[in-house]
Amino acid sequence: MLKATIDAEIFRESIDAIAALVTECRLHTAEDQIRTRSVDTANVAMVSLELQSTAFNSFSATAGELGLDIAKMKNIIGMMGKGDALTLTLLDEERKLELSFGGYRYSISLLDVNTIRKDPNPPGIDLPGKAVVPGDALNNAIKAAAVISDKIALGIDPDAMTFYMEAEGDTDHIKLALGEDELVALSPVQARSLFSIDYLKDMGRVMARADKVEVYLGIDHPVRFVFDIADGNGRVEYLLAPRIEAD
């Protein structure tokens, strides 16, 4: 069972965070939250999202699992206006989800959860380096790197006390180093890994809205991004596998 009302912008933010990586997901409902964890089709990136009941204007749910077509949901939320209140109602007998807002009422068929990949287990990886970065600064650096390369290195230089982002093209080079004055926080542990710009561009557009993003790094290890949504009543985590650097 699910019956909830939420601000349209909060729901849009949540769907956008998931849509950055996947087109469908298993959405788990509980008495106090909804959550999902999904991996992209190439097994390169993972998204986890939790939205607490306090993010909603009203919320009533029991434990359950829904198969959501995220691509379809993204098209629907494009119709929602600022200030709209969205009501979500699970029609159990029809296995449909009803979305009502601004005079519209959509009834969408849910996907069979058995056709959707099971929730992945988060890898137990030690990522000792940590930088807390303003979301817009992170996104701007990703966009700047995309101009000259299809990959970007993220790292921490403990000697210089900086978190840096660096890209190398055929003839061009760009580097942005953020010091302690420009960061929210820094754990100065040597770290550096190379990542695909394509994945980061999609994540970056979502992270740009966050006041701060926690970035966890190692050496040639995945990167983990963690940030709040819904005024602190929700949380998103991205995990991205590294690209192997050629010698």
UniProtKB/Swiss-Prot annotation:
- BP GO annotations: leading strand elongation; regulation of DNA replication
Q: Where are the annotated coiled coils located?
A: none
Example GO molecular function: DNA binding
Which UniProt key words apply to this protein? Answer: DNA replication, DNA-binding
Q: Which domain of life is it from?
A: Archaea
Per the record's keyword annotation, is DNA-binding included, yes or no?
A: yes
**Cystine crosslinks:** none
Q: Does the keyword DNA-binding apply?
A: yes
Chain ranges passing through the membrane = none
- What does the subunit comment say? Homotrimer. The subunits circularize to form a toroid; DNA passes through its center. Replication factor C (RFC) is required to load the toroid on the DNA.
The entry's family comment says:
Belongs to the PCNA family.
HAMAP family cross-referenced by the UniProt entry? DNApol_clamp_arch (MF_00317)
Functionally, this protein is described as follows: Sliding clamp subunit that acts as a moving platform for DNA processing. Responsible for tethering the catalytic subunit of DNA polymerase and other proteins to DNA during high-speed replication.
Q: What is this protein called?
A: DNA polymerase sliding clamp
Name the source organism: Methanoculleus marisnigri (strain ATCC 35101 / DSM 1498 / JR1)
Organism lineage string: Archaea, Methanobacteriati, Methanobacteriota, Stenosarchaea group, Methanomicrobia
